């Protein structure tokens, strides 16, 4: 379990890996039982004891799932604000997989080979005929401002005119800006 004290210890550390693994290719995405709620798996259940895992052999219920189900109501009333926020994040990312043509059907273009300065961020482009997504995952524990290099080859390969003003939408927050898609961009990351 990602949130287990035996592993990452914090479910928020799974946000950047989710973004990368869900949006990188057209593959299906599997979310482990309760991961979207920050399930820690730290109960001392069954034969395994407290080991940061959830037993699959014993009659056991996972606390976050039990509270989410709320006796079949699925009304989220028993979830904490942190759990609701994380669940919302997972829903947004997974909905992008379905709603974005670039993710659903498009091509992957890695940008890391021209961005060796990035130590805790990972960036790539997903492109289809109708849509281009610039994906930036911030693995750092704090907000940061970075410069992203985009090779001229990307513009040539996809037939995109460099320095053309584009309307950019942050698909997680909904905020929009208009700026040029250029070979040297400086976005601020949360």
Predicted regions and their residues:
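Secreted, luminal/periplasmic, and some membrane-associated catalytic domains
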Residues: 1
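Loop/helix patches that line or flank the sugar-binding groove of alpha-linked glycan CAZymes
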Residues: 4-166
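Structural signature of nuclease core domains in nucleic-acid processing machines
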Residues: 134, 177-178
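C-terminal beta-strand-rich structural cap/linker in extracellular carbohydrate-active enzymes
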Residues: 178-190
């Amino acid at each position: 379990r990602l949130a287990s004290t035996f592993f990452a210890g914090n479910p928020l550390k799974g946000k950047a890996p989710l973004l990368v693994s869900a949006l990188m290719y057209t593959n299906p995405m599997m979310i482990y039982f309760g991961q979207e709620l920050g399930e820690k798996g730290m109960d001392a259940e069954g034969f395994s004891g407290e080991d940061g895992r959830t037993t699959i052999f014993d009659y056991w219920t996972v606390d976050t799932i039990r509270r989410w189900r709320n006796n079949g109501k699925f009304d989220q009333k028993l979830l904490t604000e942190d759990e609701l926020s994380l669940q919302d994040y997972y829903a947004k990312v997974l909905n992008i997989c379905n709603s974005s043509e670039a993710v659903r059907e498009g091509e992957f273009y890695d940008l890391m080979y021209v961005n060796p300065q990035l130590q805790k961020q990972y960036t790539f482009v997903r492109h289809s005929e109708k849509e281009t997504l610039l994906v930036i995952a911030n693995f750092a524990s704090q907000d940061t401002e970075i410069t992203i290099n985009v090779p001229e080859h990307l513009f040539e390969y996809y037939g995109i005119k460099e320095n053309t003003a584009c309307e950019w939408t942050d698909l997680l927050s909904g905020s929009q800006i208009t700026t040029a898609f250029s070979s040297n961009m400086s976005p601020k990351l949360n």
